[in-house]
């Protein structure tokens, strides 16, 4: 019984995330973004959405939540997640030989069915300067 509940919960979580990413793509396309890749992977590295916005490459992390009872979706993006996004972006840029300015955006999607609350946070974070 517990195993079934856990599997069902994980499936619902995955489905919600997928719907959130679908909504984010529609939102971006409506704003004129050209979607280059969704769920791009290279080994363990992964990027939710890579898009072109004019002359910039936008790397977009999508966070979807049922509600904000436990905080805002963007608060789930911590330093560790940012490091993973940066490493994944580096792999992406090298593979496709991208020579564009890069920015890192976040799109939050809140709700379980339309209409969702969607917020786009351009330039949500900058790569840290490591020594």
Language-model segments: which ranges?
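Residues at secondary-structure transition points
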Residues: 11, 15, 19, 44, ...
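Conserved catalytic cores of phosphodiester-cleaving nucleases, focusing on short active-site segments
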Residues: 28, 47-68, 77, 85
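Short acidic/glycine-enriched loop/turn segments that link adjacent beta-strands
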Residues: 42-45, 114
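Structural motif
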Residues: 44, 57-59, 101, 118
């Amino acid at each position: 019984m517990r195993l079934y509940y856990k599997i069902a919960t994980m499936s619902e979580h995955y489905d919600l995330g997928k719907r959130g990413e679908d909504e984010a793509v529609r939102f971006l396309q409506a704003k004129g973004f050209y979607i280059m890749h969704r769920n791009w992977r290279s080994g363990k590295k992964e990027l939710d959405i890579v898009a072109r916005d004019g002359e910039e490459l936008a790397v977009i992390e999508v966070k979807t939540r049922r509600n904000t009872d436990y905080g805002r979706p963007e608060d789930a993006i911590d330093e560790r997640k940012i490091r993973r996004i940066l490493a994944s972006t580096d792999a992406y840029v090298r593979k496709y030989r991208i020579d564009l300015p890069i920015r890192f955006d976040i799109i939050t999607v809140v709700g379980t069915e339309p209409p969702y609350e969607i917020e786009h946070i351009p330039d949500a974070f900058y790569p840290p300067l490591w020594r």
